[in-house]
Regions:
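Short phosphate-engaging motifs
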Residues: 62, 135, 180
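An internal, acidic/charged active-site-proximal segment
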Residues: 141-221
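Active-site-proximal, Lys/Arg-enriched surface segment
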Residues: 57-131
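A common structural microfeature
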Residues: 28, 37, 49-52, 89-96, ...
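Gly/serine-rich nucleotide phosphate-binding loop at the start of the catalytic core
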Residues: 1-67, 71
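Short, conserved catalytic/metal-binding motifs centered on acidic residues
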Residues: 40-44, 48, 88-99, 126, ...
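Electropositive, glycine- and tryptophan-enriched low-complexity nucleic-acid-binding patches
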Residues: 54-55, 59, 113-168
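Short, conserved acidic/polar surface loops in the N-terminal third of protein domains
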Residues: 101-108, 137-138, 184-186, 208
Length: 221
């Protein structure tokens, strides 16, 4: 896996239009690969925080090419990790992640909202589980009330999974209670996929009973 990661870093570096931007990218990747919990630009020992800020916000380089390269590499890893023979399972995790923000952000005002009493940027992220690794594949920003719900965004991400994954794997969707809506579950079923999600105890069954009142069987006997 280390050799594959090194190859990916090299391919990403080659996408940079100048040597200066290539060095900035390598400095940013170094912060994450150190895994010290300090990936912010000011912790870089190679480049200044202002240089990395310009690289991320001003310098012209193709985000699409970066995403395309990473996804191609990810698919290669998925297929290399799959077992030969019968159609293997592929776990797809959908998670709602909040990046809490304080203060005012005029340029991102439409992206900052409150969810579960947390103010910030709320991301619906889709991960592919490859061996021991959980690799982010795609994401959408929940924009607050009046916009598509996290469950609706999660369903859109699932629908946009590459067909080659759906054709070669038994895709198993794993998600928490934020994605346990009827629309999400029926949508997954229409796609002929499988899903395991959390369901709030306040949900009602067809017969009117509340989930939390259902008798729990005694397995000790």
């Amino acid at each position: 896996m280390l050799a594959d990661a090194q190859a990916l870093v090299y391919n990403l570096s080659e996408l940079m239009p100048t040597q200066y931007q290539k060095e900035n990218l390598e400095a940013m990747l170094g912060l994450f690969l150190e895994a010290q919990g300090n990936p912010l630009p000011e912790h870089s020992k190679i480049k200044s925080a202002s240089a990395l800020s310009r690289f991320l916000n001003i310098n012209p380089w193709s985000t699409r090419n970066i995403i395309r390269t990473i996804r191609t590499h990810t698919l290669k890893q998925v297929f290399s990790e799959s077992l030969k023979g019968s159609k293997p399972f592929l776990q797809v995790i959908i998670d709602l992640t909040t990046l809490e923000k304080c203060g005012k952000f005029q340029e991102y005002e439409q992206l900052i909202s409150v969810y579960n009493k947390k103010r910030g940027l709320h991301l619906v992220v889709l991960y592919l589980v490859v061996g021991k690794w959980r690799i982010p594949w795609s994401f959408r920003v929940w924009r607050g009330k009046g916009s598509p719900s996290p469950a609706q965004l999660g369903l859109k991400l699932v629908k946009r999974l590459p067909q080659e994954l759906k054709s070669n794997f038994q895709v198993m969707i794993l998600a928490d209670t934020a994605f346990g809506s009827r629309e999400f579950l029926h949508g997954i079923r229409k796609l002929k996929l499988y899903a395991i999600t959390g369901v709030a105890i306040s949900r009602k069954l067809i017969d009117g009973r509340v989930l939390k009142h259902i008798h729990r069987p005694d397995f000790s006997r």
